[in-house]
């Protein structure tokens, strides 16, 4: 029987990041997923970045993560957020071509010779003599020294559309929850939702506001210059709000009285109307999903209304009245594990050879999932090699802030990173990630020597120009000049905070 060093259950954003990071320093890695077609898929909003989230992606870029590289390759629309505010809250947001993104992920993953991929359904997980047995539906089993569970929102989950309920009764998903109950892991429920997708060929563009792309910086590799796709904006009005109120009985969110909590910063349209009754208009962003698809993502219209009500709702919104629904909106309720049972290295406190990463830890968003996947992957590989595990610090990275909050305070709602979550946000900026994390990345074995030397040459140039600041030519060294101005701006704070 072949014994694997690491087996990763689930191949979403956290699972793929875990596999890529572990494969840098370790061999004999296996990914088990129930559907190979969904490898690297963006199941909800096709966007990466945002306030706080882009800081995580930039940190992943320095650690050799796959998400920043794939998002730079597949971006079709870019926005620089908070540009008029201080540099510490400047954030980058990409609209992603979901097909290009998935294909790039698959290309990188299939080129890795030390990663095996298997499509299978898991029935049972058993710990036995410092090993883990993973049984599939055919009653065969894999043996692993370490497993990383990255099952996302698909553990014991149910989909709700109006009064219709569809349980995802795949043996793999349900048994993971049951297997972990046996080791006294606290399990509870969360929910999330997704809006409908429309046919963009039937939009009335004359009645929509246009949102143009910014030609901004990239996370790392600026090799996609086709980020010129337009997004569009429309609004609800009083008539639409009243229509939803009248048909609220057809919403599973209110009709079935959910006890689980959804993400605060991504509420459904029903939630918005009842929680903010004085708001007559709620913005709706229409975001194209791909160059190769006619689907458009209706950001801001997440709901769990019935099929017929969703059709009628679309017919009442300005600019999309004549469009057709390609995919309907729905809510999904799923199990998550209390992250306080984890060490900051993301292995379970009382089961050191089991790591948990992604939305099963109570987070929301691709960026948070990928960050956890990276930490779980690199630490599982270091554990195999009997090296000390990496414990991210909250004072020098947003990854540290994320894991510190999860493992110390747990969650009351799906956790989303923000710059406001960090006490040191003036120091943890998008522009100085190289200075903060380059040595850690090289120490962990994530950064090739060539790239390490390149980044060090940039740092050397920066300090050399800092000494000769009067001789700098603005247009020849604009990036360095800007960086010097920013760092001098925050010098007093950093000196007071860190060099008392």
Swiss-Prot record:
SUPFAM superfamilies: FAD/NAD(P)-binding domain. GO terms for biological process: tRNA methylation; tRNA wobble uridine modification. Its cofactor is FAD. NAD(+) binds at residues 262-276. It is found in: Cytoplasm. InterPro entries: FAD/NAD-bd_sf, MnmG-rel, MnmG-rel_CS, MnmG_N. FAD binds at residues 10-15. Gene3D superfamilies: FAD/NAD(P)-binding domain. Keywords: Cytoplasm, FAD, Flavoprotein, NAD, tRNA processing. One of its GO terms (cellular component) is cytosol. One of its GO terms (molecular function) is flavin adenine dinucleotide binding. PANTHER family: GLUCOSE INHIBITED DIVISION PROTEIN A, PROTEIN MTO1 HOMOLOG, MITOCHONDRIAL. NAD-binding protein involved in the addition of a carboxymethylaminomethyl (cmnm) group at the wobble position (U34) of certain tRNAs, forming tRNA-cmnm(5)s(2)U34. Belongs to the MnmG family. Homodimer. Heterotetramer of two MnmE and two MnmG subunits. This is tRNA uridine 5-carboxymethylaminomethyl modification enzyme MnmG. It comes from Carsonella ruddii (strain PV).
């Amino acid at each position: 029987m072949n014994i694997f060093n690491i087996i990763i259950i689930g191949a979403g954003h956290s699972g793929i990041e875990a596999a890529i990071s572990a494969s840098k320093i370790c061999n004999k890695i296996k990914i088990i997923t129930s559907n190979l077609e969904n490898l690297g898929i963006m199941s909800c909003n096709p966007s990466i970045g945002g306030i706080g989230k882009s800081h995580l992606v930039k940190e992943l870029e320095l650690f050799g993560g796959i998400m920043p590289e794939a998002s730079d390759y597949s971006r079709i629309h870019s926005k620089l957020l908070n540009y008029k505010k201080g540099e510490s809250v400047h954030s980058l947001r990409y609209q992603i071509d979901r097909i290009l993104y998935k294909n790039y992920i698959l290309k990188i993953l299939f080129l890795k010779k030390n990663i095996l991929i298997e499509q299978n359904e898991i029935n049972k997980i058993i710990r036995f003599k410092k090993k883990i047995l993973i049984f599939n539906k055919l009653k065969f089993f894999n043996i692993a020294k370490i497993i990383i569970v990255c099952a996302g929102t698909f553990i014991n989950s149910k989909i709700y559309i109006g009064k219709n309920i569809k349980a995802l009764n795949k043996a793999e998903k349900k048994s993971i929850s049951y297997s972990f109950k046996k080791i006294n892991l606290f399990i509870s429920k969360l929910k999330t939702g997704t809006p409908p997708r429309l046919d963009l060929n039937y939009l009335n563009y004359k009645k929509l506001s246009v949102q143009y792309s910014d030609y901004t910086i990239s996370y790392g590799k600026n090799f996609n210059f086709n980020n010129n796709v337009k997004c569009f904006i429309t609004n609800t009005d009083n008539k639409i709000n009243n229509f939803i109120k009248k048909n609220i009985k057809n919403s599973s969110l209110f009709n079935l009285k959910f006890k689980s909590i959804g993400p605060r910063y991504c509420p459904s349209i029903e939630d918005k109307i009842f929680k903010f009754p004085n708001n007559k208009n709620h913005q709706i962003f229409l975001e194209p999903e791909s160059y190769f698809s006619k689907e458009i993502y209706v950001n801001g219209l997440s709901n769990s209304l019935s099929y017929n009500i969703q059709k009628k709702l679309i017919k009442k919104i300005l600019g999309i009245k004549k469009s057709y629904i390609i995919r309907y909106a729905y809510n999904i309720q799923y199990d998550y594990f209390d992250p306080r049972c984890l060490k900051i290295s993301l292995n379970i406190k009382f089961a050191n050879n089991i790591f948990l990463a992604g939305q099963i830890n109570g987070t929301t968003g691709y960026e948070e999932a990928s960050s956890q996947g990276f930490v779980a992957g690199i630490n599982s590989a270091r554990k195999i090699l009997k090296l000390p595990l990496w414990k991210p610090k909250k004072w020098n990275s947003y990854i540290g802030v994320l894991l510190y909050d999860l493992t110390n305070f747990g969650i009351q709602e799906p956790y989303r990173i923000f710059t406001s979550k960090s006490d040191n946000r003036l120091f943890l900026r998008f522009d100085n990630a190289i200075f903060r994390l380059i040595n850690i990345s090289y120490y962990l074995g994530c950064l090739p020597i060539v790239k390490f030397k390149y980044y060090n040459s940039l740092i050397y140039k920066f300090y050399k120009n800092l000494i000769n600041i009067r001789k700098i030519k603005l247009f020849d060294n604009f990036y360095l000049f800007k960086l010097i101005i920013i760092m001098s701006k925050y010098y007093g704070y950093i000196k007071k905070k860190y060099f008392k």
